[in-house]
């Protein structure tokens, strides 16, 4: 048991530990946001009429945009493909949800959106980590260029 704990501790404290943390963060936040997007797809017709339209694009179009971001961008985040670009629509969506959707900003109403926002900003700054399709593509391109 102590060898397993020691190995786990060494792995988490190594440089790979941060890459594993980014992988887990991407997978967990991606799946969680994906559930929001899938729920919007399943109830699109019912939501369309009363969906908040805080920036004046129309309720249906606002719903379509956030649904595409929550599903499409979350899938990209999960696999780590164009991760820094993929989190930008999610950051915008969470800013709109946190600061514009509900009148009179309150922490209670905005807490979940702010939590997602902080995670997406972290991924924007840190990138997807070593265990991502972005890294695989970078390594493949580097090999092709060097040959």
Q: Where in this protein do the model-derived segments appear?
A:
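Extended, low-polarity transmembrane helix blocks
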Residues: 1-42, 60-68, 72, 79-147
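Perimembrane loop-to-helix junctions flanking transmembrane segments
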Residues: 47-60
């Amino acid at each position: 048991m102590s060898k397993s704990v020691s190995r786990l501790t060494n792995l988490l404290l190594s440089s790979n530990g941060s890459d594993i943390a980014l992988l887990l963060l991407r997978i967990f936040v991606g799946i969680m946001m994906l559930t929001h997007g899938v729920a919007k797809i399943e109830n699109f017709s019912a939501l369309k009429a009363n969906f908040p339209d805080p920036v004046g694009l129309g309720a249906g179009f606002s719903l379509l945009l956030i649904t595409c971001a929550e599903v499409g961008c979350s899938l990209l985040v999960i696999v780590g493909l164009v991760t820094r670009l993929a989190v930008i629509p999610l950051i915008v969506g969470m800013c709109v949800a946190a600061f514009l959707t509900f009148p009179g900003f309150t922490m209670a109403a905005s807490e979940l959106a702010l939590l997602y926002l902080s995670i997406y900003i972290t991924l924007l700054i840190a990138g997807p980590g070593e265990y991502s399709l972005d890294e695989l593509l970078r390594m493949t391109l580097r090999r092709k260029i060097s040959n």
